[in-house]
């Protein structure tokens, strides 16, 4: 809305507007005024996205402390990671629909409030179940904020500035994994794991304030029909599948686990069938029939799942296997995070010049070397060797992931762009959750098999190697998939 002085000046300096053009002119005027400082307008969303990625990458280093305080197993503690990613994966497909029903500003503030409440609950909870409940609330908030940020960028910035705006958003998101493990380690060393959630709460309040003051709703609410059956099926299907895989580490091949897996697979099969037959599906899964999208999307998913699995195991191995405290473990992971951010920034420019295939293969080879170095880590390994393995691995991953992601989205027709991005992000989060759960199962199985006659530290190192082998297999799969991809010039 225009202020009183602005309305007065408008009346004095403009000619009468024809009635049929009044609404359009008013809308254009509002847009010009509102979007005069687009980065300031987006500040709350930038903070929210940073917070979501910081939360996703900083919790791994706190898992040993949670196990010690609550007396839980590694398999139970993994839910702090898996539950968060599962919540994101379930919410993501629904955000596009929510933005058409609820004003973007309202939706983002609600999402950030969910994150704030979740952070406070996790920080203050005396029992693990409530810590996990707060963590899942944080995942819901992140799952809404991330796609909302990119949707707002497409409408707030003029076409000539969208590339630069996406670059700013990318830098914000890349900065979080760089400092996440190190910051979490420092907070645990100085205070406790609860300080991590206290920090999340403070940043949440800042993001809410910036959104309330600066953000406007750039997305029109059209209120299309909601296919409730699809929404429910996606929640049940993804939830049962990830829960079933995650419970294997503690319950084995029990009836509950098998039942969850069967229900998850059947419901997801129904979900896919329904999306393919609806006139207005929740997600247009016909995109998966495009080889130019599906092959690089699978490469992205494999590399993302590998990264999460290895980054889930590595900080725990530093503490439980090599005997470092949380602060030292966080500092040892800083170099790899910095290198990853730098390479992520450069991978996009190299993609424009060389295409996806050579970069994916180069990245896969580097990641394979890094994974093999991880396999060579033992109880007496010097810190410098771990840093070397981590740095080599983290150099390779962005060349794989960024290049394959660009290739997947580049060849999509314009009308598939939004669904393609959502499908890709959903695949990453859900498969990442499953991959982390599988890595946990392998970690615990290897730990149990190698404990006889070994110290607890050696047993954890033995179990970690099983998880690293799983990550190595995923990288090899991504490398083989690169031979099926055809570049689009």
Question: Where would I find each of the regions flagged by the language model?
Answer:
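Peri-membrane helix termini and adjoining interfacial loops of integral membrane proteins
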Residues: 18-22, 207, 446-455
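Membrane-interface helix caps and helix-loop-helix hairpins in membrane proteins
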Residues: 128, 219-224, 247-253, 379-380
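Cytoplasmic helix-loop-helix junction between adjacent transmembrane helices
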Residues: 137-171
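Membrane-embedded alpha-helical segments in integral membrane proteins
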Residues: 56, 60, 64, 117-122, ...
